[in-house]
Design a protein with these regions (language model features):
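Alpha-helical, largely C-terminal catalytic domains
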Residues: 1-178
Length: 178
């Protein structure tokens, strides 16, 4: 269901699309990276939290910041319903609750991974010419809570989308193919 559930914020940005499943994968990868860069954090727990934090959206749909001004979602009920009958239901519910409370180091890193996944998408849209992405980027970066995420965000914002494949030292490759 999550691979067919669209992230709805892009409607307001005017460009792009992403499913909740795509977002969760990106968030989990970023969460793993952040956990590896931050000492004393349980990386496996961060990855699980990143993978599970939007599971309720399989029942509720994705509610972006504009929607949340007007609609209240019963995420606890959605989580309880989707986890019902699973032998690991308590773990799923606990990880989602911990993510939402944002009190543990793992929850803070997971929340920052969630924001960095959006930041990466916004940076791509900016580099491709979206006129609204800059304002979104400024607001998104303000949500980051950990120093490791803030450092990564700074590096992302200073790097062009094509920099990884279009390096100056590889300029001859683009001409000669070698």
């Amino acid at each position: 269901m999550l691979k067919r559930t669209p992230r709805t914020g892009y409607r307001f940005l005017g460009t792009g699309e992403e499913s909740v499943a795509e977002h969760l994968f990106s968030t989990a990868f970023i969460g793993y990276c952040l956990a590896q860069l931050d000492e004393g954090v349980d990386a496996f727990k961060v990855v699980k939290m990143c993978l599970f934090h939007d599971l309720p959206e399989a029942r509720t749909g994705d509610h972006n910041y504009v929607y949340k001004k007007y609609v209240q979602v019963d995420e606890e009920r959605a989580t309880a319903d989707l986890a019902a009958g699973l032998p690991f239901a308590d773990e799923i519910k606990g990880l989602i609750a911990e993510f939402n409370e944002r009190k543990t180091p793992e929850a803070l890193l997971s929340h920052d991974a969630d924001q960095l996944a959006l930041l990466l998408q916004l940076k791509e849209h900016k580099d491709l010419g979206s006129r609204y992405a800059d304002e979104w980027l400024r607001n998104n970066a303000k949500r980051l809570q950990t120093e490791v995420a803030k450092g990564l965000a700074e590096a992302i914002l200073q790097t062009d989308l094509s920099a990884w494949w279009f390096k100056k030292e590889d300029a001859d490759w683009w001409i000669k193919g070698k």
